[in-house]
Amino acid sequence: MPTKIQIVFYSSYGHIYKMAEAIAAGAREVGDVEVTLLQVPELMPEEVQVKSGIKGYRAAFGSIPYATPEVLAEADAIIFGTPTRFGNMCSQMRNFLDQTGGLWMSGGLIGKVGSVFTSTASQHGGQETTITSFHTTLLHHGMVIVGVPYSEPGLTNMTEISGGTPYGASTLAGADGSRQPSENELQIARFQGKHVATIAKRLANNK
């Protein structure tokens, strides 16, 4: 039976979606895994989406199905992606996680691997606090937290401004959202996907 990896994300302008695709590519490098991308529902009123331009950007990944709390229980590992909002996860992701009380009651996520990636507008925009505060919810669910070890050389790349932390992959979008994930950031994301899948497979095989 394949090890099941879910990548559950929210993306406004596509940066987190691009990182999610890179993470999925890395996870698929591990043999006998099944990788599924899922997004969480939008909360923003449609008129605000149109005015801000988000609606157009989100159309690029509109075909990706929405996650439900029940579906999470089917995974061996879940990698969550969220943009930063004032050093925390976005409201869309928080709203989704607040619906997982039933899973908490049943212990449905205990022992599953949990991991997080993020994006910020600026270099010091709260990447690390977003990921580590997200970990609190995963730990309440009894998940096994996995980050990005320093065996990934992109974490110590000093030749460019780049996201990427030992807590999880990250990217910088710029104040206007014009900066796209760099190759270094995408490589860290691919590493995270492969690393999580490897550990999840090992744990699943030892059940």
Curated annotation (Swiss-Prot):
GO CC annotations, alphabetized: membrane
Q: How does it assemble?
A: Homodimer.
| Entry EC number(s) | 1.6.5.6
GO MF annotation list: flavin adenine dinucleotide binding; FMN binding; NAD binding; NAD(P)H dehydrogenase (quinone) activity; NADP binding; p-benzoquinone reductase (NADPH) activity
| Residues engaged in binding FMN | 11-16, 84-86, 119-125, 140
**Which reactions appear under catalytic activity for this entry?**
1,4-benzoquinone + NADPH + H(+) = hydroquinone + NADP(+)
Q: Phenotype on deletion?
A: Cells lacking this gene are not completely unable to grow on PNP.
What does the protein in this record do?
Answer: Involved in the degradation of para-nitrophenol (PNP). Catalyzes the reduction of p-benzoquinone to hydroquinone.
Tell me which HAMAP family the record gives: NQOR (MF_01017)
Q: How is the cofactor bound?
A: Binds 1 FMN per monomer.
User: Quick one: which residues bind NADP(+)?
Assistant: 13
The similarity annotation says: Belongs to the WrbA family.
Ranges for the Flavodoxin-like domain?
Answer: 5-196
List this protein's GO terms for biological process: 4-nitrophenol catabolic process; generation of precursor metabolites and energy
Question: Which InterPro entries does the UniProt entry name for this protein?
Answer: Flavodoxin/NO_synth, Flavoprotein-like_sf, Flavoprotein_WrbA-like, FMN_Rdtase-like_dom, NQO
Q: Which domain of life is it from?
A: Bacteria
| The entry's keywords | Flavoprotein, FMN, NADP, Oxidoreductase
Recorded hits in Pfam families, A to Z, give: FMN_red (PF03358)
The pathway that the record names for this protein is: Xenobiotic degradation; 4-nitrophenol degradation
The entry's protein name is p-benzoquinone reductase
The cofactors it requires, by name, are: FMN
User: What is the species of this protein?
Assistant: Pseudomonas sp. (strain WBC-3)
